[in-house]
Amino acid sequence: MRQLVRRGTHLGLLLAAFWLPTSPALAQEEKPIHMCPGCLAPVFTEQGKGSITPYGRIEIDAIYSSGNTNPLDPAQFNGYATAAGPNRNNTSTLNPRYSVFGIRGERTDGANSLLGVVEADFYGEKDVAGSVLPRLRLAYAKFSRKNYSLTVGQDWTPVMALHPDLIDFSILGYGGNLWQRIPQITFRYQFNENLEGLLTVLRFERGLYAIGGQRQVRPSAAPAGSGQGDAPFNDSSNDAFSDPIQHPYYGTRFAYNKDGKMLAVSAAYRYYRSAPAPGLTPGGFGSGGFTSGRDINSYLVGTEVVYPLSKTLKFSGELGYGQAIGQEFFRFGQDLNLTTGKPIRTLMGWGQLSWAASRKHTFLAGAGFDNPNDRDVQGSTANAGTQYKSNHRTYLTAIRPIWSDFYVGLEWQHLWTTWAVTTGPQHYQGDTYNVSFWYNF
């Protein structure tokens, strides 16, 4: 009992030290303040000196693609990530959507520092007039003190954090690179000059609801003419509140850096119990064939490496293995078999050689792969253009500044995709060619 009392007293003192003034003199100097969570005006302006810096990128991408290349989410124009079919209707486009505008706010008193970033691109859906709309890209605050930091808000995925350098805006998505910009709470700790570790929780705001027609929703009272236990239809106003995923991902990463070399290991996990997908016709996903009520253990383990081969040549890459890995890692629609509801296990990875031939010339050569377990995707007959048995990509890239921070880049990509269909041809190939101009300011 005495030990419990002592522990309780110690905890109380710690809480008091956090919430209460540190000295009577300080308490007399500082007046109480009514703080408002929704207010925008800064209050503690005397704590450190700050600055605000606008920044951004203006970009135009001229893209030519064979009819065999296709974005898996065309509404988002997220790059040409798969080889879609036998059609040879080649296409071209001029795309300004990868332009970015951001504001960075910083404050420090020498011991503590704050960094706030709000950043937007233009990959939002078009309005009724066909205008390109801005979309939230990053919005986070980072507090740092001594050898630790706390990041809260929407930032890049903190696990499997290494990415290739190619121009394509899918960043090798569906092709072995696991990435996303996602809401998170991440604590980082610097053990020494070379070793850093982190703990994180992360998830999309709307979970599976973000996938449109592939989303799951909990069963509700059956409307007239439908079966008991069917999921609500796509236009249900309750869908956003019926997401079966309640847990975020819980993740960790340890990275060792020295002399330009880096080795990192990552792991992430979450659990949920699957719910029905919106009912379509039997044989497709939905109440006709999608088996819900499964215990879904979604996990990811992986490693990342950067290794300089010479002063001008560098290798980087990553290798990951996981189950039920979906939109949180830019694998929309690849987490569960859309016909059976079974979680899909996947081996993924990529590698890249970067050659800095001179101060004004950089050349890249890389390849990536995403190979779901064939037994897990077996029987997936719905959305044959969505779920694949394998998806591979290679690329060659050249980058050169024209003047100052105005650049031109050339890129070629070749894609191989084997679709998870049971009849007809399954394997297709395609190419894309990209000429990009961008100005970083």
Predicted regions and their residues:
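Outer-membrane beta-barrel biogenesis signature
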Residues: 25-77, 361, 400-406, 441
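Cleavable N-terminal export/targeting peptides
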Residues: 1-36, 224-226
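Membrane-spanning beta-strands of outer-membrane beta-barrel proteins
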Residues: 96, 134, 180, 245-249, ...
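Outer membrane beta-barrel
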Residues: 41-74, 84-209, 213, 246-262, ...
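Transmembrane beta-strand segments that form the barrel wall of outer-membrane beta-barrel proteins
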Residues: 113-124, 203, 265-271, 362-371, ...
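Detector for outer-membrane/organellar transmembrane beta-barrel domains
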Residues: 256-392, 396
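Outer-membrane beta-barrel "beta-signal"
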Residues: 400-402, 427-441
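Surface-exposed loop and membrane-interface regions of Gram-negative outer-membrane beta-barrel proteins
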Residues: 28-36, 70-99, 103-145, 159-173, ...
